[in-house]
Regions:
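Glycine-rich, flexible loop/turn motifs
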Residues: 24, 52, 62-65, 128, ...
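Active-site phosphate-binding strand-loop segment of PLP-dependent enzymes
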Residues: 2-58
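PLP-dependent aminotransferase class I/II
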Residues: 75-148
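Short, glycine/charged-enriched secondary-structure capping and boundary segments
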Residues: 28-31, 61-64, 91-93, 107
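Alpha-helix N-cap/helix-start motif
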Residues: 25-26, 59, 116, 136
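Short, conserved catalytic or adaptor-binding loops enriched in Gly and charged residues
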Residues: 66-71
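Bacterial carbohydrate/catabolite-sensing allosteric modules
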Residues: 5-13, 30-34, 43, 61, ...
Length: 148
């Protein structure tokens, strides 16, 4: 995404996949992420960061998300467990800036959750007891071995 071109539009929302962006497979550099943040700050825009599959990095250091770099709360972070646990685990999540929560609840509060409560409880326990992080670490080790 060329931010110079983005600045010439009336766009108020920018949807990005900074890790292995489809279809190019390119991961956004730190400077590109900073450009996105500058655009949001100067235009008053919102960034929706879709961070799916970022857990599959072969690097021993995780990539910084745009969400983690943006102190002014103009980034909505979304991700899913579909890629990291199983395709049948149709659970996604969104981290909203506090100022967006009320509007989200007002507009989306009437939608019913399609994820069974039991799956939500099992996933919560899997995360809370550290098994999810261990699972990701095993996958990353295997990916590094395959890359050699």
């Amino acid at each position: 995404i060329l931010t110079s071109e983005l600045n010439r539009t009336n766009a108020s929302v920018l949807h990005i996949t900074p890790f292995r962006s489809f279809p190019s497979g390119i991961t956004a550099s730190a400077s590109k992420k900073s450009e996105y943040i500058r655009w949001a700050n100067t235009s008053g825009g919102i960034i929706i960061e879709d961070d799916f599959a970022s857990e599959f990095t072969v690097s021993t250091k995780n990539e910084d998300t745009v969400f983690s770099l943006e102190p002014t709360h103009s980034v909505i972070y979304v991700n899913t467990f579909t890629k990291t646990i199983a395709p049948s685990m149709r659970v996604g999540y969104m981290v909203l800036p506090k100022e967006f929560v009320g509007a989200f609840e007002k507009k989306m509060g009437f939608y019913s959750c399609t994820v069974p409560v039991f799956e939500q409880y099992v996933l919560t326990e899997f995360i809370n007891n550290g098994n999810y992080e261990r699972h990701l670490n095993r996958i990353r080790r295997k990916l590094r071995q395959l890359q050699k």
